[in-house]
Swiss-Prot record:
It comes from Treponema denticola (strain ATCC 35405 / DSM 14222 / CIP 103919 / JCM 8153 / KCTC 15104). This is Trigger factor. Its EC number is 5.2.1.8. GO terms for biological process: 'de novo' cotranslational protein folding; cell division; chaperone-mediated protein folding; protein transport; protein unfolding. InterPro entries: PPIase_dom_sf, PPIase_FKBP_dom, Trig_fac, Trigger_fac_C, Trigger_fac_C_sf, Trigger_fac_ribosome-bd_bac, Trigger_fac_ribosome-bd_sf, Trigger_fact/SurA_dom_sf. GO terms for cellular component: cytoplasm. HAMAP family: Trigger_factor_Tig.
Amino acid sequence: MDYEKNVTLKEKSHAELSVKIKKSDVQESYKKLLNKYSKELQIPGFRKGKVPVSVLETKYGDAIKGDLAGDLIEESLKEIFESLDEYERPLPYSYPELNEKPELKVEEDFSFTVHYDVFPKVEIKKTEGFTIEVPEASVSEKDIKKELERLQERNALVTACKEGTSAEKDHIATIDYCELDDEGKTISGTERKDFVFTIGSGLNIYKIDDDIVGMKKGESKEITKTFPEDDSNKDLAGKTKKIKVTLTALKYKDLPALDDDFAQDINEKYKNLDELKADIKKKFEISVEEKIKSLQKNALTEQMVKEHTIDLPESMVRAELESRWMMMANQFRTTPEELEKMFGKGPQSKAALLEGWREDSEKTLKERVLIETLLKEKNIEVSDDEIEAEYVRLSERMDIALDELKKYYSNPREKEYLSEGLKEEKLFKALYEKSTIKKGKKLTFDELLKD
């Protein structure tokens, strides 16, 4: 197809593409379309395939020209976009739109203009000479003990307490409860049966843990509680409630002993408790290493972004917000459409939530754009040998058979993720060498990972 094109880059990573298709191509395409319709259309008074072109033009001329305009736009854009560089072609989620409906005249060149969003073009300025502070952390015996206790809890047997046992902290209570009015009658809609919680956890609406202590199975009790003005539950803040509670069941957790048998019950690969402890320590140390690496990368990226102008197109921001909404729907195990119905309208509507996420989404996108630009500018690649070495490292680190790991990464998409991650590691390794990394505050394992 013979055409002229011109791309103009505008603000907010927006582009306009003007196209002029030569009249010779317009006329040739018009003739082909007329011939096609003359063979396919059946008009009263004419045999199928024998409709004169002049009749077609008289009866369907405008419609045929409209179809031709659409075909020419589609064909030319496909060809043009394949020839443009990545900073001039549209983003996958930015569909080109016509500035105005073009008029097609068979005897003239056909011109039209479309606009769309493109990948932000960033002029790289400062990427070195920064000072970043990264916290320190280590794994203590206390951290390992805490994890062992968590495993104990997870593997505990829940057993009913003997009749007549008084409720204590850490017992598992099953209660029926309701609110009472001034006359001691049940307030409709406040009843709840078979509510289960661990005494001392505070995981109950009225925070009645201490009031349950001492009660026995089958016993009922009326509790009056006044809640502070700043209570986290706005429905209770500053109010006094009278609650009737009946303890219907009382159980306790029978924790397994921390011994070699316990370790083997967790996983047969552990011969004794010491091996389990060593594995916990190894996994925690990996978590510390990965977290510190992530904090270091984020700290440098954040400083670099401040030194650059990055114009994000609205379609890119919108796509990121919709992606987060979809992830939220997956967490709720529902569809994005159903999630929107669940939240309804008002301060917690989809629109309100997305607007609340906008600032963080834009920050994340700017970081991604800058990193991607640096990877391209520095032409960073990874070799097959580097990927193989990473397979071995991950196999040892994750305690997974090498063949099994390679099978997972035989999926092209997963292998691409791995490759991109290695490229980023190479990029940041080079960037760190040209900046100063200072040791920051010493944190505990829990403090480091709390986010």
